[in-house]
Regions:
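N-terminal low-complexity or simple alpha-helical regulatory segments
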Residues: 1-155
Length: 155
């Protein structure tokens, strides 16, 4: 039997998913050529995957399996998408460049690798990759703040 807290969790997650998908659809429809809109679509979809992957019944069934690795990878890489989104919002001359895709792909691969090696006993390499994964959100949050600060006077 579902508890009131479980039902509230499902309600809030469902609402958030609906809003994220609506935002992605509206940005795609209304601003098909704007880099900030594309970055907004990407982060909205990435966050939708993260919300779905964090649902308790999905975590119970998929955690530790290879099927869960892309969800973890996307969740880790969302920090990079946040940085790209901020860059696109504040920099009028923003264009998506290869280093943006490289940063996103690297963060995703790091998250996937750590998910797939979750059952492995602690090794120096695993400790290093887990430390790097924990640093990803902090590093890209700082980069987002720097990007906003660099361009805020122009706006």
């Amino acid at each position: 039997m579902a508890t009131p807290l479980t039902l509230l969790d499902a309600l809030l997650r469902g609402t958030l998913l609906a809003l994220l998908l609506l935002m992605a659809a509206v940005l795609r429809r209304d601003r098909p050529r704007a880099p900030a809109a594309w970055a907004g679509v990407a982060i909205s979809l990435g966050l939708a995957v993260q919300v779905l992957g964090a649902m308790p019944w999905i975590e119970e069934r998929l955690a530790g399996s290879a099927w869960f690795a892309p969800v973890i990878g996307i969740s880790v890489a969302n920090a990079v998408l946040f940085w790209v989104f901020v860059e696109a919002l504040f920099d009028d001359d923003f264009a998506l460049r290869p280093h943006h895709a490289l940063a996103w792909g690297t963060a995703m691969a790091l998250g996937m690798m750590n998910c797939l090696s979750a059952g492995v006993h602690a090794t120096p390499l695993r400790d290093l990759t887990m430390t790097l994964q924990r640093a990803v959100p902090v590093v890209f949050a700082v980069l987002a703040v720097l990007a906003a600060a660099r361009h805020w006077r122009a706006d």
